[in-house]
């Protein structure tokens, strides 16, 4: 999985929440998710983080750039069948902060109208999501 490739090589069960709070902010329930064995070495994971950060800072994922944050990611554009229909799927998967991933998200746009490249149309959507989510998670700008 992509998350395993950027978090030190550890496989983590995907999850949507870590705790439930009452009206006063007191933790009512905490969810625990186990980590499984490594699927790649820490060195491979570190190299992957660095390369995917460059996709956003220097490459096709520039539209995912968010000032003050380091984001890593990968763009993708694929043509659907039949090819003669001229339809595409545009996507971007990204994680932040790039050097210590805390969140991973993916945007998939089926049959975009006009421009259809993942880095052009999907990457900015994840940037806008992270613009709201990262401060909410307490991840500060550098």
Positions of PLM-derived features:
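Active-site beta-strand/loop architecture of penicillin-binding DD-peptidases
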Residues: 2-36, 43, 52-141
């Amino acid at each position: 999985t992509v998350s395993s490739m950027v978090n030190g090589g550890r496989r983590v069960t995907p999850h949507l929440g870590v705790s439930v709070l009452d009206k006063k902010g007191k933790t009512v329930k905490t969810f625990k998710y186990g980590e499984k064995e490594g699927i790649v070495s820490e060195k491979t994971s570190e190299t992957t983080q660095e390369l995917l950060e460059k996709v956003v800072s220097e490459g096709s994922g520039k539209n995912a750039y968010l000032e003050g944050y380091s984001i890593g990611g990968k763009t993708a554009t694929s043509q659907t069948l039949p090819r003669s229909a001229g339809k595409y799927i545009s996507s971007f998967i990204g994680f932040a902060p790039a050097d210590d991933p805390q969140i991973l998200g993916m945007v998939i746009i089926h049959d975009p109208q006009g421009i259809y490249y993942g880095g052009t149309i999907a990457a900015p959507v994840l940037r806008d999501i992270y613009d709201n989510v990262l401060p909410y998670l307490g991840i500060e700008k550098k």
